């Protein structure tokens, strides 16, 4: 969810790194391209050429700066995963696949996985495909509840506010 997701990711890397001094932390290059066009809009309209070019340029920039792999903290951007991966020689971590794999391996006999995401992510079915590939049933919110999820993401979190938990 924009800069918030990047911040959360970085905080988690720090929290899970065993380090007693600065030099023991993981070297990272952070790229927050806040002016990136809206991914959901690009998926819905099919007008995605400019967005794909920007995503691939960012990936090549990270590679040039010495990154050994790339983590994209935006679920919706993973709709363009193949384009991004094809633009670089280093691995791009597929957050969708990793998330589904985590759920399947973390919880014994999991049969269903709930998906709360933008309309672009839901509409693209990227989580649905990963769930089915892993042998679990994807579950998405009703249209009414999906509107609440979108409001939480766009009106709250992307606007720099803390999420309204009452919407859930």
Predicted regions and their residues:
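Non-catalytic structural scaffold of enzyme domains
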Residues: 1-168
């Amino acid at each position: 969810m924009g800069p918030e997701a990047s911040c959360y990711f970085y905080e988690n890397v720090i929290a899970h790194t065993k380090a007693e001094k600065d030099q023991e932390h993981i070297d990272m290059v952070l790229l927050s391209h806040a002016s990136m066009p809206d991914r959901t809009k690009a998926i819905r309209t099919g007008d995605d050429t400019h967005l794909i070019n920007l995503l691939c340029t960012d990936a090549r920039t990270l590679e040039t700066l010495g990154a050994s792999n790339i983590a994209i903290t935006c679920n919706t951007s993973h709709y363009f995963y193949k384009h991004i991966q094809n633009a670089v020689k280093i691995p791009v971590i597929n957050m969708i696949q990793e998330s589904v794999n985590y759920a399947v391996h973390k919880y014994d006999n999991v049969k269903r996985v709930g998906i709360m995401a933008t309309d672009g992510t839901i509409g693209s079915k990227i989580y649905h495909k990963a769930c089915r590939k892993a042998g679990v049933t994807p579950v998405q919110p009703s249209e009414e509840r999906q509107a609440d999820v979108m409001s939480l993401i766009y009106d709250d979190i992307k606007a720099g506010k803390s999420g309204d938990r009452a919407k859930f």
